[in-house]
């Protein structure tokens, strides 16, 4: 049964109906690989949403970074508000992997900081995959890393049903075995408490509490309740409480794992002794024996993931089970921006193994640590059954899987044509660019400029700034959150020009950009290859007056192919518009605060130095501000404010001031609603 309910204020048009029909036919007929070659701004996400809705398959959408994953997740949640659209990325705010540098004899211990909200979203994704069919998971490449054993995770779930009799002591023990901790004072995710005949659990995948009310040994009621006020939110007939961690190891398997680790240790020590590596042997023996003692006593140790092969009972060299293994058999894989995502996917294993080999060779880890790894590319494709590659510039590998066939989508619903390409000589290019920027600035339009080196970008930024141009410089050292802010400021008109080395960022959605300038376009290389040029030119493809300026003294083969492809698309688009009487119109798109930006901004932004409006909100003077015309400054600071109010709400609840906590909760709810309306 197809439970997907697609909601959109418009119907497929342009090339979308044809692309949707062909993709659906391919999926239903069992085609293993298909490629959608969709030009920038043609509505590829909406096309994929329709394919998912019509095929009714659970879907994994793979993006090559968490920012794009968040953008996709937001869009799909708007299309499928009644279905489960989940977000699965690495839950580390900060991660420094364990490493050893032999040249300087430097050991670097693993350090990491886990984002609890993202961890909750990851658990929500796996819970949804177990409990329903209408599930779309938008994930980053982190989904190819080990994620426990799905069968053990499901088997370990503690089930409760109204009317059933339970042994409370056994249920509490099961929760502890599933890595929940008892705390009768403060309950949060991964904790539970028991008061009289009421058991309350903070599940790993919810921000609500599960309250189980008992009458003797019989379950009288099961409810979702607000963790701060105790307000009943929903009544249930039954509920499954999944483990607090994805890695679940039964007692019998832990015992056999300890035995296997001990045997492997003996073999490796004998090997080191034979090779005369006495220091390495001592180092390995000391560390591993300590880890074994910790595993025996508490079932956990630092770096426990390095023993994952033994704890999972896998054979040497076999692939780990990951998010993909939580999907049912008939799932659908969608690889977004496949020309970037596929190479990234194929490179993950080799990079991981190079680091692990050094640790193993120098006695920091057992050889089995090498099996705590991402999937190899061939293992990944063996697990996937049907795949849709999505890109404006598909790579050769993807096209080879489809035997060179692809489905094209070049008509934009807005009727906007691909940018006009204007090739100009490099002599006097900076003065020429400055005059073009001033023309756009007067029209309240934006400009992107891409250079070949950081030094050139810095010098150009300084020159433009000295000439009274509002300009910013985007480079690799800027944190991803600051990058989001810079892009939002460009759209808001805080400045007119963005300069960078590599602005071809796939998925960068900037409808206000009318001019893209590519300096040194005739210098062959990665940044001026055909695909890079097409992607960069495409940044101006959402504007009615879109133009791409290529400064070059020669026509390279890459330039010729990129110009030819752009002209071909313009011809098709222009003809379609003439036949159908379509006048190009701007692609108006609201400025978004993505899931990712909201999560990280709410955690990281300084809550000090709030604006007057925000001070009024903290002082409970919210109604006038919330009902007033949108204040962008307020919107920008809102995630920080929500974080501040949540802390005040928790403090009020701890002090048993539930009336104040409820009042703060309602204000936070208003703020979240305002934020969602304007994103």
Curated annotation (Swiss-Prot):
Keywords: ATP-binding, Cytoplasm, DNA damage, DNA excision, DNA repair, Excision nuclease, Nucleotide-binding, SOS response. Signal peptide: none annotated. ATP binds at residues 38-45. Residues 25-412 form the Helicase ATP-binding domain. InterPro entries: Helicase/UvrB_N, Helicase_ATP-bd, Helicase_C-like, P-loop_NTPase, UVR_dom, UVR_dom_sf, UvrB, UvrB_inter. GO terms for biological process: nucleotide-excision repair; SOS response. Residues 639-674 form the UVR domain. It is found in: Cytoplasm. HAMAP family: UvrB. PANTHER family: UVRABC SYSTEM PROTEIN B (PTHR24029:SF0). The beta-hairpin motif is involved in DNA binding. This is UvrABC system protein B. The lineage of its organism: Bacteria, Bacillati, Cyanobacteriota, Cyanophyceae, Synechococcales.
């Amino acid at each position: 049964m197809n439970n997907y309910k697609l909601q959109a204020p418009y119907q497929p048009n342009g090339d979308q109906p044809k692309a949707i029909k062909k993709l659906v036919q391919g999926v239903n007929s069992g085609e293993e690989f298909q490629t959608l070659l969709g030009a920038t701004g043609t509505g590829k996400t909406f096309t994929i949403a329709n394919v998912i809705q019509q095929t009714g398959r659970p879907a994994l959408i793979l993006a090559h970074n968490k920012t794009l994953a968040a953008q996709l997740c937001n869009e799909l949640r708007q299309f499928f508000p009644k279905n489960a659209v989940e977000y699965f990325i690495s839950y580390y705010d900060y991660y420094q992997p364990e490493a050893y540098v032999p040249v300087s004899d430097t050991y670097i211990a693993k350090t990491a900081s886990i984002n609890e909200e993202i961890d909750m979203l990851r658990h929500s994704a796996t819970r949804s995959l177990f409990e329903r069919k209408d599930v779309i998971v938008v994930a980053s490449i982190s989904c190819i890393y080990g994620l426990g054993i799905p069968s053990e995770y499901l088997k370990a779930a503690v089930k409760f049903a109204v009317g059933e009799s339970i042994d409370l002591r056994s249920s509490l023990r099961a929760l502890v075995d599933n890595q929940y901790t008892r705390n009768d004072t403060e309950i949060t995710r991964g904790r539970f408490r028991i008061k009289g005949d009421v058991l309350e659990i903070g599940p790993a995948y919810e921000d609500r509490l599960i309250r189980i009310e008992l009458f003797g040994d019989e379950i009288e009621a099961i409810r979702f309740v607000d963790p701060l006020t105790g307000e009943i939110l929903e009544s249930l007939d039954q509920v499954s409480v999944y483990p607090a961690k994805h890695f679940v190891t039964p007692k019998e398997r832990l015992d056999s794992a300890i035995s296997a680790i001990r045997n492997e240790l003996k073999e490796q020590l004998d090997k080191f002794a034979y090779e005369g590596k006495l220091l390495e042997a001592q180092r390995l023996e000391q560390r591993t024996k300590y880890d074994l003692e910790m595993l025996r006593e508490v079932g956990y140790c630092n770096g426990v993931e390095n023993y994952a092969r033994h704890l999972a009972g896998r054979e040497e060299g076999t692939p780990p089970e990951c998010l993909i293994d939580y999907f049912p058999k008939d799932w659908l894989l969608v690889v977004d921006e496949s020309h970037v995502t596929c190479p990234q996917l194929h490179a993950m294993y080799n990079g991981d193994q190079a680091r692990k080999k050094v640790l193993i060779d120098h006695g920091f880890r057992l050889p089995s640590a090498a099996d705590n790894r991402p999937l190899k590319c061939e293992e990944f494709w063996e697990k996937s059954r049907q795949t849709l590659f999505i890109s404006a510039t598909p790579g050769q590998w993807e096209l080879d899987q489809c035997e060179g066939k692809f489905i094209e989508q070049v008509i934009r619903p807005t009727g906007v044509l691909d940018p006009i390409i204007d090739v100009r000589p490099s002599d006097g290019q900076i003065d020429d660019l400055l005059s073009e920027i001033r023309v756009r600035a007067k029209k309240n339009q934006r400009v992107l400029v891409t250079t070949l080196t950081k030094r050139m970008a810095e010098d150009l930024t300084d020159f433009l700034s000295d000439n009274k141009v509002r300009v910013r410089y985007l480079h690799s050292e800027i944190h991803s959150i600051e990058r989001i802010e810079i892009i939002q400021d460009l759209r808001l008109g805080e400045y007119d020009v963005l300069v960078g080395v590599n602005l071809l960022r796939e998925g960068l959605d900037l409808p206000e950009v009318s001019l893209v300038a590519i300096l040194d376009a005739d210098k062959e290389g990665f940044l001026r290859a055909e695909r890079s040029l097409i992607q960069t030119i495409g940044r101006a493809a959402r504007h009615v007056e879109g133009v791409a300026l290529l400064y070059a003294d020669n026509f390279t083969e890459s330039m010729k192919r990129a110009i030819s492809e752009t002209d071909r698309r313009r011809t098709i688009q222009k003809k379609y518009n003439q036949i159908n009487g379509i006048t190009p119109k701007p692609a108006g798109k609201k400025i978004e605060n993505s899931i990712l930006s909201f999560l990280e901004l709410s955690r990281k932004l300084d809550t000090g130095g709030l604006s007057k409006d925000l001070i009024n909100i903290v002082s409970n003077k919210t109604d006038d501000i919330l009902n007033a015309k949108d204040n962008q400054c307020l919107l920008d600071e809102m995630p920080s404010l929500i974080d501040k109010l949540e802390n005040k709400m928790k403090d009020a609840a701890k002090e048993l001031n539930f009336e104040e906590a409820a009042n703060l909760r309602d204000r936070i709810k208003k703020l979240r609603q305002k934020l969602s309306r304007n994103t």
